[in-house]
């Protein structure tokens, strides 16, 4: 939303430095985030850089307050600030990666007319089998038990919703600008891989869980690059991610930054 992070920017010098760094790398980002029109901020190429700065600013503020994470994860775009927090990427490189990601995913959203719907109250295997009945519909976000978001061709999404309802589930169409985390985004993954190969990649200093697998990130540089790049065109297995993070940990010590 317009104005997100503005209070922190005004009150926290480190947050201000972070936003100012983003502004120096991509002029106009801070104005769109703090003062722009809502329609402008919802454009993928603007949303992603603004969310990156806001996510990381609040995570760092918690750390400065003595609340340091021993494990992190992010949903979709949120995985990139989590990578910066975990020391896998420098803040500057992570922001540059987000700019590439947002720009390319925005372009592909224009190229491919996509739609998305949440499939509710059905087992994952039922939703997956229903997706296979269509040429270009895929499960993309495994959010929680009984809730899987599916995306793909805008021409097929209504029929997919009808098929979900026929099988006893609920289907809710979602207002999105593109079919993210589908094969439509393969070109974005390729662009990200090229960019990552020119960046310094470090082993995680804080345990970080990958959207694509729901498991901790690998330590090997080539595998880290592959995991980050393919995330844009792969399903987000967030239910598995949370289950694995909570294994052996207390839920009351979990913080969610949106």
Descriptions of predicted regions:
Residues 3-6, 187, 240:
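Generic recognition of short, well-ordered alpha-helical segments
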Residues 1-129, 174, 254-257:
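FabD-like malonyl-/acyl-CoA
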Residues 23-30, 36, 86-235:
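Alpha/beta catalytic cores of group-transfer enzymes, especially the acyltransferase/condensing modules
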Residues 236-244:
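A short, well-structured juxtamembrane/interface segment
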Residues 67, 169, 250:
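Short phosphate-binding/catalytic loops that engage adenosine nucleotides
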Residues 243-246, 251-258:
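Glycine-rich anion-binding loop/nest that anchors nucleotide
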């Amino acid at each position: 939303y317009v104005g997100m992070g503005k209070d922190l920017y005004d009150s926290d010098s480190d947050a201000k430095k972070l936003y100012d760094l983003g502004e120096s790398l991509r002029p106009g980002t801070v104005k769109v985030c703090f003062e722009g029109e809502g329609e402008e901020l919802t454009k993928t190429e603007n949303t992603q850089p603004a969310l990156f700065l806001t996510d990381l600013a609040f995570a760092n503020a918690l750390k400065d307050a003595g609340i340091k994470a021993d494990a992190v994860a992010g949903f979709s775009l949120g995985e990139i600030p989590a990578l910066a927090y975990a020391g896998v990427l420098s803040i500057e490189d992570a922001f540059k990666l987000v700019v590439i990601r947002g720009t390319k995913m925005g372009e592909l959203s224009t190229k491919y007319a996509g739609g998305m719907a949440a499939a509710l109250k059905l087992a994952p295997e039922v939703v997956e089998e229903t997706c296979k009945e269509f040429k270009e519909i895929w499960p993309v976000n495994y959010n929680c038990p009984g809730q899987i978001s599916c995306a793909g061709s805008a021409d097929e999404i209504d029929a997919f919703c009808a098929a979900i309802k026929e099988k006893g589930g609920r289907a809710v169409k979602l207002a999105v600008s593109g079919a993210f985390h589908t094969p439509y985004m393969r070109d974005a993954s390729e662009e990200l891989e090229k960019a990552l190969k020119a960046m310094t990649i470090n082993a995680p200093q804080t345990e970080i869980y990958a959207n694509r697998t729901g498991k901790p990130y690998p330590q090997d540089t080539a595998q880290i690059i592959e995991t980050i790049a393919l995330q844009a065109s792969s399903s987000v297995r967030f239910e598995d991610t949370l289950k694995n993070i909570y294994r052996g940990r207390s839920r009351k010590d979990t913080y969610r930054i949106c």
